[in-house]
C-alpha cells in the first residue's frame, strides 16, 4: 500500500464488536491494518450496539463507541435487540459530535447509510473533509423479502427521528459522497444507473491468504466429534434467512442418503433468533441431530475459525442475496472447494466449474440440485481438490489485502481531489 499521509482515516460502521463478527467487520479491520502499515492512524468510531465497553483495541485498531437510540415510539426490548443485530436505523448525537471534534482527520469512511451515514456526511461537510461510502450489505440490490424482514421490528411504530434524518441529509449521502465504493459488481451496475454522478467504483473485499493457508483440521474434527473419514460440509455465515441455511439442511438430508458418514457444520452469530430456532427444529425433524453441528459465531482471531475451513471437504454458501461473499475467499485460501449461490456479487466472484460450483437458490429443484453437487464432490475427490486449489490461486492472485489496500488508497485520493475541486 502506498505511503499515506500521517493523519486519521475515520471508519464509521453501525456497530463493531468482536463477538458478533461478519464480513463487514473483517473488511474494516483489514483495511485499517493496511492503513497502519502505510503510516496512517485509522480509528473506528461506532455505536455501543451489542458492546459492553466504550473504547477497545480490536486487532490492533482503536474502536471508540458512543451511546445511541432507535428513534421510534413503542419499541420492545426484543425489537431493539433485533435492530442491533441487523439493519437498525440508529441515532447517536454523541457520535456525531465526536466525528466533528476528532483531531487530524484526513478522510471519513462511512460503512453505513441512513441516519448514521447522514451524520458522517454532515460532519465531513462542516469540517470541509472528504467522505467516502462503502456499500457492504447492498442498497440497490436487496431482495424485497429481506428488506421486509429488516423492517419488521419498526412495523406500525411511530418514528420521531425523521427531523434528524432531514437535518443530517440522510437521503443525500450517496449523491453527496466524494466516492461510493461497491463490493459487488451487480451493486455497481445498479448504482451507476441510479446515482446522478460517476464517482462510483468496484472494489472487492480481500483476504489474508497467509492466515488461512494452514490450519489443524484434525483438531477441529476431534473437538466436535467428527470422524476423520467423514465428508464434512461447512457453512460459516450469520444464522439468518438471507444466508439460507435451511436449504442447505434439506439438501444435506438428501445427500446423506448417498453418503451416510457425512457431517454438516454451521457456524455463525444468530442475527435472526426465530430463524435459528427453525433450523434447530429442522435438524430434529430430519433426524440429523447427530450429524449436524450448529456452533456460535467465532471471533476473527480464534484459531478454531481457520481450523474449521481445514476440517471441511467443501464450503457451501447458499445465500438468497450476497453482495460479495468474503467467506468464499477464506475457503479458497484454505484450498477448499466451494458451492455458492448464483446471486449478487457471487456471480462475478466464482467461475462455475473452475473455481467453484453454482446453484440457484430460487429454483424449484434447488434442494435436489445442491444435494447432487455435494454427491458429485464426495464421489470425485480429485475434482473436489482441483476446485479448491484453483480457488486458492485465484485468492492469492487477485484478493490479497495488500492489493486491495493500494486500490482503496487510489480511491481516497480521487475523493480528496473531488473535495478540493468543490470546496
Name every feature range the model reports, one short phrase each.
Residues 297, 307-312:
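Short alpha-helical donor nucleotide-sugar binding micro-motif in glycosyltransferases
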Residues 276-299:
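Nucleotide-activated donor-binding/catalytic signature segment of Leloir-type glycosyltransferases, i.e.
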Residues 337-340, 350:
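Short hydrophobic beta-strand element within catalytic cores of glycosyltransferases
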Residues 186, 206:
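Carbohydrate-associated surface elements
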Residues 320:
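Aromatic "clamp/platform" in nucleotide-sugar-dependent glycosyltransferases that forms part
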Residues 10, 227-243, 249-252, 265-267:
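Conserved donor-binding/catalytic core segment of Leloir-type glycosyltransferases
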Residues 118, 126, 139, 157-179:
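Membrane-proximal helix-turn-helix segments that form the acceptor-binding/catalytic region
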Amino acid at each position: 500500500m502506498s505511503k499515506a499521509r500521517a493523519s486519521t482515516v475515520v471508519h464509521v460502521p453501525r456497530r463493531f464488536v468482536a463477538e458478533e463478527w461478519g464480513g463487514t467487520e473483517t473488511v474494516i479491520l483489514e483495511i485499517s491494518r493496511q492503513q497502519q502499515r502505510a503510516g496512517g492512524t485509522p480509528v473506528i468510531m461506532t455505536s455501543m450496539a451489542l458492546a459492553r465497553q466504550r473504547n477497545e483495541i480490536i486487532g490492533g485498531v482503536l474502536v471508540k463507541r458512543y451511546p445511541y437510540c432507535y428513534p421510534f415510539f413503542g419499541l420492545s426490548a426484543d425489537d431493539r435487540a433485533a435492530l442491533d443485530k441487523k439493519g437498525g436505523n440508529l441515532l447517536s448525537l454523541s457520535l456525531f459530535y465526536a466525528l466533528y471534534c476528532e483531531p487530524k482527520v484526513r478522510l471519513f469512511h462511512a460503512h453505513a447509510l441512513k441516519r448514521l451515514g447522514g451524520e458522517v456526511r454532515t460532519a465531513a461537510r462542516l469540517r470541509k473533509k472528504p467522505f467516502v461510502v462503502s456499500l457492504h450489505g447492498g442498497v440497490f440490490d436487496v431482495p424485497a423479502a429481506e428488506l421486509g424482514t429488516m423492517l419488521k421490528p419498526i412495523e406500525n411504530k411511530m418514528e420521531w427521528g425523521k427531523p434528524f434524518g432531514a437535518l443530517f441529509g440522510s437521503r443525500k449521502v450517496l449523491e453527496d459522497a466524494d466516492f461510493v465504493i461497491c463490493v459487488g459488481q451487480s451493486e455497481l451496475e445498479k448504482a451507476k444507473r441510479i446515482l446522478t454522478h460517476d464517482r462510483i467504483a468496484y472494489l472487492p473485499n480481500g483476504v489474508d491468504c497467509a492466515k488461512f493457508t494452514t490450519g489443524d483440521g484434525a483438531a477441529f474434527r476431534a473437538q466436535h466429534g467428527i470422524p476423520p473419514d467423514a465428508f464434512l460440509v461447512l457453512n460459516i455465515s450469520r444464522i439468518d434467512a438471507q444466508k439460507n441455511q435451511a436449504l442447505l439442511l434439506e439438501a444435506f438430508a438428501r445427500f446423506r442418503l448417498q453418503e451416510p458418514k457425512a457431517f454438516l457444520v454451521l457456524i455463525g452469530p444468530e442475527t435472526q433468533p426465530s430463524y435459528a430456532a427453525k433450523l434447530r427444529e429442522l435438524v430434529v425433524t430430519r433426524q440429523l441431530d447427530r450429524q449436524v453441528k450448529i456452533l456460535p459465531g467465532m471471533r476473527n482471531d480464534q484459531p478454531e475459525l481457520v481450523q474449521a475451513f481445514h476440517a471441511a471437504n467443501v464450503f457451501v454458501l447458499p445465500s438468497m442475496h450476497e453482495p460479495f461473499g468474503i467467506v468464499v475467499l477464506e475457503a479458497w485460501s484454505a484450498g477448499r472447494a466451494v458451492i455458492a449461490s448464483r446471486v449478487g456479487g457471487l456471480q462475478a466472484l466464482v467461475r462455475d466449474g473452475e473455481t467453484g460450483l453454482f446453484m440457484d437458490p430460487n429454483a424449484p429443484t434447488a434442494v435436489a440440485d445442491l444435494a447432487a453437487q455435494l454427491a458429485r464432490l464426495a464421489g470425485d475427490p480429485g475434482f473436489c481438490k482441483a476446485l479448491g486449489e484453483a480457488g486458492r490461486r485465484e485468492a492469492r492472485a487477485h484478493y490479497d489485502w495488500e492489493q486491495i489496500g493500494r486500490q482503496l488508497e487510489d480511491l481516497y485520493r480521487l475523493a480528496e481531489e473531488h473535495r478540493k475541486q468543490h470546496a
